[in-house]
Amino acid sequence: MINIEEQTTTNTVIFLGAGISYVAGVPIQSEILKTICNNKEIFYSNNGNIFIKFLKDNFGLNENCDNLPTIEEIYSFLDFFISQNENLNSKYPVVKLKNIWNIFTQLICSVIETEVYVGNKADNAYNKFWQKLVELNHKISIITTNYDSCFFESFDNLYSQNYLLNYNIDFANYYDEYMRDINSFFWWDKAEEGVNNTKIIDVYKLHGSLEWLYCSNCNKVMHLPFFHANYNLENGELKQPLIFNEKGESIQRIATCPVDKCKYQILIVPPTYNKNFNNSILKDLYFKALLKLRMAKNIIFIGYSFPDADYHIKALFNRVNMTRKNVVVIDKFLDDNKKRKYLSICNHVKFKEIAFENCIDEFTSYLSD
């Protein structure tokens, strides 16, 4: 039997955190709640009002919204009552708490979507980094906990070089019955190594994606490349992405599954301590990512802060023999606490205190062949 830890192929896994999306305008987790409270569209919406009233009643939020709890505190508070199926009080029965939990998740999605602005700085850095990766004589895999796809949207420049992204999910996009009435803009080529000289970069989005619409009835995910679904702030309904023909006319809405007509949900794992990985698609991604890590010679972290709620990520690496791995952490803001978390999974980590956009030129020097 081949020991995957002893294979000779140079496999490099890059683990991307929020820091790589920050340059594109995506708020880091510690900024999301403040952004929610300062966003006028959210603040004056029905669901925004429900959520902020909940914070005032249970976390003492003041009028200036400058005494905010953490995201994890809010989710943990809600999870306590929901998991026990208990009311908080007469004002907040468990059914209302479940609704607030959903509203909070929807607001996080909305903030990430509306705050994104990919300027030249992000475009140039992303394109340059992708080109650097494909020039390596390595098998590249990317693992990320980010919901957004700012970094991956810049990959389209590599299609002409026969590169494809493989998200390791059997997307509904691959099946005619799902795509029969869907505009070709949402077609997604199935990544198969070697077909028409195709070269594959594997991607594992462990916390899901804002581009993934999930049908819980048929257990299929529709991938919406270069389009981001969003929620109606008044009623919580998933906004239906419009597809337009050459005349600019709306011809299709796909917020419901084309096959069984059930409502789609965005497939993400919220930043809560009590993460639910019962979804078979995300569970499968987790174990596929574990296999890639075991095969890797290089593991490069970029902009990942190792938040306390990501205990499952620590567990992921604790299941890997890190002894012979070349492990590098690239982060603009490295403090002792963050270093301690990394050293708990590997005692020979190399720390590079540098911003993502400034590390690209010397990136190859971080790798072992």
Say what each PLM segment does.
Residues 101, 105-115, 257-272:
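Active-site-proximal helix-loop elements at catalytic-domain edges
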Residues 1-153, 159-163, 360-362:
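Gly/serine-rich nucleotide phosphate-binding loop at the start of the catalytic core
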Residues 54-94, 133-269:
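Extended, H/D-rich, highly charged conserved domains that either
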Residues 119-128, 181-190, 238-242, 274-290:
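A Trp-anchored, charged/polar loop motif used as the substrate-binding/catalytic surface
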Residues 113-115, 173-179, 271-273, 299-303:
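N-terminal start-of-chain detector that recognizes signal peptides
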Residues 1-24, 29-40, 46, 53-55, ...:
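SIR2/sirtuin-family catalytic core signature
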